[in-house]
Amino acid sequence: LKSQTLRKSGLLGLHRGEERFDQLGGLDNLKAFCRRALARSNTKSKHRPRGVLLLSPPGCGKSQFAKSLGNETGRPTLTLDIGSLMGSLVGQSEQNIRHALQIADAMAPAILFCDEIEKGLAGAGGSGQSDSGVTARVFGNLLTWLNDHTSDVFVVATCNDISRLPPEFSRAERFDGVFFVDLPTREQRDAIWQIYISEFDLDAEQERPDDEHWTGAEIRACSRLSALLDVPLAQAATNIVPVASTSAESVNELRTWASGRCLSADEPGIFKSRTTGRRRRRRAVHGNPLNN
């Protein structure tokens, strides 16, 4: 009956993949946090977990984590695309978001996955002149539900651009934690290579390309192209352009913003940027102008 209601509504998707945590390198703290939180989901409603907001550059495993979490915990993973709920008739968008969230409540216990949520909520904090305030009202309905719902629905929302997300969305008590997923470390990249070399049946002894600043998605793409084109990994890597190169400024800005504001997805505690703390060397100024 629940699945039938879901199909008829057309407002939510149902992910049917077979992803697991052991197919996802890194994110140890995030995995442990969510496992522990969901282990308490059968307690009183006031103790039930709310969810997590994941912030990172594209390709770092946020979406794969959300899909894996449902399989790890035995819950269906519902997908909510806020942009697709926008209707042309007056009041239709607001009705759609309310109905979608009611269905999510009815599907409990469940995971509700909102991918790249900033795209659906872009403009929610503006004047509302562009869409007569529709986005702001949809956003208001979502905030109310995040605050007040008592159903056993665990929200996993992902975001690539925090500047486009209204600040009140990420405040305390909307989510159990706001996590930053950084580019993988050397150790994590090695683990990711092992996963995809095995998945695509590649030679594990071959030389690997220079993968400094690569994301997990780029490692997977290189492995897939190596298998597809029947070429070594080093040759397949010539077709990969890392997001850290194409969007270096935005990646650094995102990492700087998250430092001290977000939890680390990799280890317990607050995220601290590996690049934060560099200071531009100041030119010495002498009392005698001739020496300056």
Task: Give residue spans per PLM region.
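Walker A/P-loop NTP-binding motif of AAA+ ATPase domains
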Residues: 21-210, 292
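Phosphate/oxyanion-binding loops and surfaces in catalytic or ligand/nucleic-acid-binding neighborhoods
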Residues: 199, 229, 243
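Alpha-helix capping and helix-coil boundary motifs
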Residues: 89, 230-233
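Conserved P-loop NTPase
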Residues: 214, 218, 224-228
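C-terminal engagement/docking regions of AAA+ P-loop ATPases
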Residues: 4-68, 72, 102, 106, ...
